[in-house]
Amino acid sequence: MSTESMIRDLELAEEALKRKARGPLGLGRCLCLTLISSFLLAGATVLFCLLHFGVIGPQKEQESTDTFLDMKPLTQRVRSLQNESAKPVAHLIADQLAEGQLLWVGDVANTLLMNGMELVDNQLVLPSTGLYLVYSQLLYKGSQCGKESLVLTHKISRFTLSYQKKVTLLANIRSSCRKAAEDDGEPSAWYEPVYLAGVFQLTEGDKLVVDTNYPENLDFAEPGQLYFGAIAL
């Protein structure tokens, strides 16, 4: 085969390839590429518009900022609760084993002695100056009313270095057997609760004490019936 015929065959093969590329399959490939390019261009245009008008990007940053601002009051509230929980508080109950005398305990279930509060010689010692809610309840009982009722006294006193003596903060007087006396019936068992509570400005080192004139008539059946406490406000 001559060189000229070989060159002619190559030219014919090249022409055949070009015709195939211009055929239906080649046209489909070109159309597919054109559509893909159009979609990519449209997508890029939409993304640019969203970024330009702040629909995405800056808005998410603003939402993040708003969320942080909303969290600030919650954080401040949590810190406030932590500070409040650091205030002195005490809740004492009567020792059920010391029936006949009023002795307080603060190291058993359902009692509190926190943040500096102390129980010394049956007195509650305050660790700091400020407003305090002071409270106490005593429950008295008797088997028979009899002809004469008992005059029950319940009081909370404060001993401070300024006065060098006990000063009464709260006091209450009750008469036992009131219901039986009103009914004028047969003698029966009686129960009389006496509750005290008040808010006072107290001083660091003040001592609070509960007194009653009939400790032998206190009802020690349940620990929640006789209690004494103070809460810093």
UniProtKB/Swiss-Prot annotation:
Instruction: Give the residue spans that cross the bilayer.
Output: 36-56
Compartments in which it is found = Cell membrane
**Biological process (GO), any one:** positive regulation of transcription by RNA polymerase II
> GO cellular component annotations, sorted alphabetically?
cell surface; extracellular space; plasma membrane
Family statement: Belongs to the tumor necrosis factor family.
Q: Which PANTHER family match?
A: TUMOR NECROSIS FACTOR (PTHR11471:SF23), TUMOR NECROSIS FACTOR FAMILY MEMBER (PTHR11471)
Query: What name has this protein been given in UniProt?
Result: Tumor necrosis factor
Q: Which organism is it from?
A: Trichosurus vulpecula (Brush-tailed possum)
